[in-house]
Amino acid sequence: MNAKRVAVALAAIACAPLAAQAQLAKVTLYGSLNLDVEWVTGATCASAVPPPANNNCSGSDPASQISNPTVMRVSSNSSRFGLRGSEYLGAGQVAIFQLESSVQADTGNSSSSGLASRETFVGLQGDWGTFKAGKFLTPYDDILPLFGNAPTLTTSILSTAAVWAQGPLPKSLGGFDARLGNSLRYETPPLNGFTAELQFSTRDSSGNANGGDNGDHASETRHASVWSVGAFYSNGPLDLGLAYEYNRQMRTADQNDHALSIAAAYDIGSLFGSPGLRLGGVYERLNYGTLAGSLTRDFWALSATVPIAGGSLYAMWGRASNGKGDAPDGTGVGFVVKGPDTGCDQWEISYSYPLSLRTLLYAGYVRINNRANAAYTFNINDYSIVNGARPSGTVFGITHFF
């Protein structure tokens, strides 16, 4: 046997274990493209007067405000692609991973947040539960599907996280619905319908200060961190959820925030042999520590999902209270401001219709009725407005999953 044949034989032997492992590994390319055409209205800021971080160009000068007529735009709504996979390790243990990136499907531009800008992690799974490390949403976000429109797959300005959890805002501005890097998460296996989730995100100096996505690496010196925990029950027609999140010095030094959400949903259609008619509700309390004192806000919402003509009709009403606490009037964190007329109501109705298992059409209308001193706006593809504006939007969209 010549040297070349020996080398080939040795290479084949060396690669054999890798080939065997590859046969046990499963890797899937997946994603979704969600595009819609929108008509949005609302009083917005003059171009010469840029809005501050909370999307509110305040001030009594009328020159800083424009009454904006209807604006037509095409938007990409959480479009994404990714790779996910698993490898069986033996003895019931599985290695799991996922790498997911945002896609600007309306312009074709790459995401400014980087390649792994969405749910990205590696971990282990077994009959003891699931552990993973990376970047992902917190257990607090898992409350949203109980009352929100996430199950109808109509993610857009129709997002029901516009007011709940200050959804449009990152941690550095007081949001509680952010995707967090530098995270460790454990999920229990289901036990008689019960599950629990615990996540810790460290914001210590593992990156450039005050940079990154969603407030990532908020400070190199103050050791900011996030704890998020959730407990859930799902059995038959009933779903319950309780979540709590504590943000330590995420906005600035010596100021801590925390939030509590309780949600429930019940498929009342199952009582009549026609499942799918689902009612949901949520209560939330946000608490912010400020230099001037405490600031709190309550939020309630009720929703209904009704199966109609092969699709799903979804309706929701939510109300944010005025900002309260011992901080003086005018104290604000994000959209939450202490004082009278700082609350809002959010109304929404939408209909989604599946053309197939992977393609969905949807249409809807959303409106946020801000009181005189409030400036809440849409969650996804937000729209900068002035205090007291009532932003609204009509959408027609299509989503394809692959």
Residue ranges and their predicted role:
Residues M1-A22:
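Gram-negative bacterial Sec-dependent N-terminal signal peptides
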Residues L24-W39, A63-R203, F232-G236, N370:
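Outer membrane beta-barrel
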Residues V27-L35, A91, A95-L99, F131, ...:
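Transmembrane beta-strands of outer-membrane beta-barrel proteins
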Residues V37-C45, V103-N109, P139-I143, D204-N208, ...:
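Gram-negative outer-membrane beta-barrel proteins
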Residues I66-T70, K171, D213-H217, M250, ...:
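Extracellular loop and loop/strand-boundary signature of outer-membrane beta-barrel proteins
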Residues N77-F81, R118-L124, L180-L184, S225-V229, ...:
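Hydrophobic, lipid-facing positions within transmembrane beta-strands of outer-membrane proteins
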Residues R222-A224, S228-P354, Y365-R367:
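Detector for outer-membrane/organellar transmembrane beta-barrel domains
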Residues V386-F402:
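Outer-membrane beta-barrel "beta-signal"
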